[in-house]
Amino acid sequence: MLPEKNIFGKTSYDIFYRHSDIRQNLLGFLKFQPASRILMINEGKTCLVGMLEKQGCKVTRVTDRDAIRIADQQYDVIVQIGELPCGEDKAEVTYKKYFSKYKELLSSDGMLIVAVQNRLGLKYFAGCKDDNTGEYFSSLEGYPKITQEQRQALSKKKYEWALSQAGFQSICCYYPYPDYQFPMSIYSDKCLPKTGELNANIRNFNADRYVIFDETRAFNSIIQEEIFPEFSNSYLYLCRQNEKSMQEEVIY
């Protein structure tokens, strides 16, 4: 990890994304056993990898396309960061295929961690470009111009369908805020955000955006209507093949 003064002296978003210690918040609340075999998918040599290695974990880094070619390997934890390219299939079907492959690579009590954007996240309504297409409103419109090589986000319902169909019986959903890329808070179904808490919404480090409406006020309304999970900008899933409780994984 680069010192903060060096990060802010650079103009590259890629450097900021890879080395900002804010990103450690995504997995920092979880407990990993030393010597755990961890497969990191779509994550280069970043601060997240460094954090896990400092805990004594054995980390292997691959792309999603390489991950589905792995054979005769077993991992204690698999971490997928970001969305998947969906090709000719429906997006949720492609996700199911990848998740099924990940399940094959996990040890019997292994855990899959998936950090992804919500295609119906409030930030996309409010004027942020789609993270994968670089266009405004494309995820909200169902990706009408997407190519087979581009990546697609799903909704909460379809992510959980894909995970369930892949054979994961225990699926816990967390809500990184503002999103999984630079999370300042991690919420859960047992601890959802309260009115007024979601007030750090101008976080478009990678691209320009519009400000179509006051996101804090919109989030307040969504929270009051008890529909925040459907409009969270990102999701963080912790999944196991059986019904084992996830509480032991969480430090705080």
What are these regions (language model features)?
Residues 148-175:
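Short alpha-helix
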Residues 113-137:
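Conserved class I S-adenosyl-L-methionine
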Residues 92-111:
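A short glycine-rich, Lys/Arg-flanked "PGG" loop and its adjoining helix->strand segment in the class I
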Residues 68-78:
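A short acidic, Gly/Pro-enriched loop at the edge of an enzyme's catalytic core
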Residues 45-57:
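Conserved SAM-binding loop of SAM-dependent methyltransferases across substrates and taxa
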Residues 16-37:
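Conserved alpha-helix/loop element of class I SAM-dependent methyltransferases that forms part
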Residues 177, 183-252:
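C-terminal lobe and adjacent flexible extensions of AdoMet/dcAdoMet transferase-like proteins
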Residues 76-93:
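A short SAM/SAH-binding and catalytic strip from SAM-dependent methyltransferases
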